[in-house]
Design a protein with these regions (language model features):
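Small-residue-rich
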Residues: 1-149
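A glycine- and small-residue-enriched flexible loop/hinge signal that marks low-structured segments
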Residues: 92-276
Length: 276
């Protein structure tokens, strides 16, 4: 799979067209020296960002909320202590929360694979259709988006790969279901890595998501996740962020409907039993 040409057509057998646009939910795990009064905050606009957070964490939330065509449906901030040795406790906390994309801007390199493994387990064993945007993570799974830019410069700041994962999550979450995030522009970025066309094709084939300068603007390459190894029942369609989002949405809606029907059936059965 190479970088896309100008005319891109996305097709997937078995997925019906979704007429309405949808926005995803991004959950960020943020570290603070001093825990605020609220350690979980739901944000819909930049006005909702708590002033008591550090400047760097406030910036992370603002970056995520920028989105793309739309802003994300919601951004959830989970605040943990900077002294936390790992993410075991917070992963237990968020396991049953409803969100689509996980981001940890301050993630240490030795924890990246742990988060990728957790995402795989949630998707495979618990049918929780969540995904993570992780820096330099060759997880080889549709649940992990492997963001790899090393040079990220705006007019005011230079960012690490991990620090810009929230911005990428916001772009993906703010992409309507009618289009893909491929070629989504990042107008604030004025400097980024430089690659040849062949290098970008190789990176795309390796399941790496990146942005590049096309001579006029900085924009995302092909909207893909880290899945490289395809098997029967999980083909190249599972490598595309948009199609996985559509499939995950379908699975989630079906599961919710099943739970609703099951609960209704239980209530009816209880009423009948009460009459006996």
């Amino acid at each position: 799979m190479k970088m896309p040409s100008i005319n891109v057509v996305f097709k997937e057998k078995g997925i019906s067209a979704i007429a309405r646009s949808a926005r995803g939910i991004v959950l960020l795990i943020l570290k603070e020296d001093t825990l605020p009064s609220q350690t979980e905050v739901n944000l819909y606009t930049a006005d909702d960002i708590p002033k008591e957070l550090s400047d760097s964490n406030r910036e992370q939330l603002e970056l995520t909320l920028r989105g793309y065509v739309n802003s994300p449906k919601k951004v959830i901030a989970e605040i943990i202590s900077k002294d936390a040795e790992d993410y075991t406790d917070i992963l237990k906390t968020i396991e049953n929360k409803r969100f689509d994309y996980l981001v940890i801007p301050d993630i240490e390199e030795n924890h990246i694979d742990t988060i990728a493994t957790w995402i795989k387990g949630m998707r495979t064993n618990k049918n929780k259709r969540i995904k993570a945007i992780l820096p330099d993570c060759t997880a080889d799974t549709e649940g992990v988006i492997n963001f790899v830019n090393k040079v990220i410069r705006t007019r005011t700041k230079t960012y690490t790969t991990a620090q810009y994962c929230g911005r990428i999550a916001g772009v993906i979450a703010g992409t309507p279901m009618t289009i893909a995030c491929t070629y989504a522009p990042l107008p604030e970025v004025i400097g980024c890595d430089v690659w040849t066309q062949e290098e970008m094709d190789t990176m795309t084939n390796a399941g790496k998501l990146f942005f590049f300068f096309d001579g006029e603007k900085v924009k995302l390459g092909r909207g893909i996740n880290s899945l490289v190894t395809t098997v029967q029942g999980k083909g190249v369609s599972f490598q595309k962020i948009k199609l996985v989002d559509l499939m995950d949405m379908s699975t989630t809606i079906s599961a919710r409907r099943h739970r609703t029907i099951t609960l209704a059936s239980i209530r009816i059965a209880m009423r009948i039993a009460a009459c006996w």
